[in-house]
Amino acid sequence: MIRMSKRLGVILFVSCISINSFAKSMEADVNAVPEYNYDNIPYYENEGSLLVKMRLNGVFAHAKQKNLPAPTVPQPLPVGEFVKNGYGGDISTTIFFNNYFATELSLGFNVLRTKNSVLSNVSYNYGVGATPGKSKPLYMIPATITGQFHVAPFGGIRPYVGLGYHGSYMITQSSGIKIRNGNGFVGQIGLDFYAKDDTVINLDIKQYYLNPKIVYKPSLVGNQNITSRTKLNPLVVSIGIGFSF
């Protein structure tokens, strides 16, 4: 019995030494882990309630015509898309009500070009066959307001979506046509990349819904004006820089 007690005592003593050594080893390993410096994590803070952006635009338009009167010639030519794709720019101010909701006011200037082949075909279809000359620019100047929802307003990349309305002033230098002003809804998606606290790289896409009237003048189609509508609906893809205040 005494021998067994001694053996148990020895075993207990050795176990205590082993447990103590293991605990010290674990403590050393924990202390050896370096502390992470959280000050090195990039943090983007936007304290400003105004964000001013300047952007360059690529304009993609189809401009299919509709509601043209019946041609006066027996074998009319097809009338295709009215304008070519174009380019432009805009400037905007985004007003933040809180971190998630904002409104954007923008004014743009976009340049498209009329297609001579379409003007020639329209002139032929109404018995005139006039030659429209060189392709002329078509200017679209949209004033736009959108309400925005910023999906993830914290961090370096901040996506947003928007919905709004626009009024577009239309000008053309072509002597044979006149295009009316138009208005309609606007859909918007975009990304703000915060390079610094107050500097933003912006990628923005707007879908304009625009169906302006086109008036073909007598010099192109005969004795009286001919009116149609064109489904312009330009898609404007923009990239630019912004600053928060």
From Swiss-Prot:
* Span of the signal peptide: 1-23
Q: Which family does it belong to?
A: Belongs to the OmpW/AlkL family.
An example GO CC term for this entry is: cell outer membrane
Name the UniProt key words of this record, in alphabetical order. Cell outer membrane, Membrane, Signal, Transmembrane, Transmembrane beta strand
Q: Does the keyword Transmembrane belong to this entry?
A: yes
Which InterPro entries does the record match to this protein?
A: OMP/PagP_b-brl, OMPW
Per the record, the GO terms for biological process are: transmembrane transport
Q: Could you name the domain of life of the organism this protein comes from?
A: Bacteria
PANTHER family xref list: OUTER MEMBRANE PROTEIN W, PTHR36920
**One Pfam match:** OmpW
Q: Which Gene3D superfamilies match?
A: 2.40.160.20
Q: Subcellular location, in the record's words?
A: Cell outer membrane
Name-wise, this protein is Putative outer membrane protein RBE_0022
| Membrane-traversing stretches | none
